[in-house]
Amino acid sequence: MARVKRAVNAHKKRRAILEQASGYRGQRSRLYRKAKEQVTHSLVYNYNDRKKRKGDFRQLWIQRINAAARANGITYNRFIQGLKAANVEVDRKILAELAVNDPNAFAALVEVAQKALPSDVNAPKAA
């Protein structure tokens, strides 16, 4: 059986890892083993944080909506409840955009939500 020389592939693999690790501090950018561990962890962090980013943005949108809703005399919870009762299907991203860029349209939505809410908070829901 012919001998297989793997030096070219091994060097290519190591060079690829070290290129990915460029910019890391200390041994993590220079030593293959340390760089490989750090690149693996970095990819895991990257994957997890892409998932986490979605929740972070939702949290930001809710804070913006809540601030604008309170400026219009209603809480976030009652505002969303009123929009659902009025069958207004606008997601939180768009609501946050309206709250920041178009306060008049947001105020109109607040009016719609307030009209759809029962006047008595403790009143039973109509089935």
From Swiss-Prot:
User: Nucleotidyltransferase among the record's keywords?
Assistant: no
Residue spans making up a coiled coil are none
Q: Which PROSITE patterns does this chain map to?
A: RIBOSOMAL_L20 (PS00937)
Q: Work out whether the entry's keyword set contains Phosphoprotein.
A: no
GO MF term set: rRNA binding; structural constituent of ribosome
Q: Name one GO cellular component term.
A: cytosolic large ribosomal subunit
UniProt-listed GO biological process terms: ribosomal large subunit assembly; translation
Keywords for this protein: Ribonucleoprotein, Ribosomal protein, RNA-binding, rRNA-binding
* InterPro entries assigned to the protein according to its UniProt record, in alphabetical order: Ribosomal_bL20, RIBOSOMAL_L20_CS, Ribosomal_protein_bL20_C
Xref: PANTHER family: 39S RIBOSOMAL PROTEIN L20
Q: Please give the HAMAP family that the UniProt record associates with this protein.
A: Ribosomal_bL20
Protein's job: Binds directly to 23S ribosomal RNA and is necessary for the in vitro assembly process of the 50S ribosomal subunit. It is not involved in the protein synthesizing functions of that subunit.
Protein family membership: Belongs to the bacterial ribosomal protein bL20 family.
Q: Which NCBIfam families match?
A: rplT_bact (TIGR01032)
Q: What is this protein called?
A: Large ribosomal subunit protein bL20
Give the species this sequence originates from.
Answer: Streptomyces coelicolor (strain ATCC BAA-471 / A3(2) / M145)
What's the gene? rplT
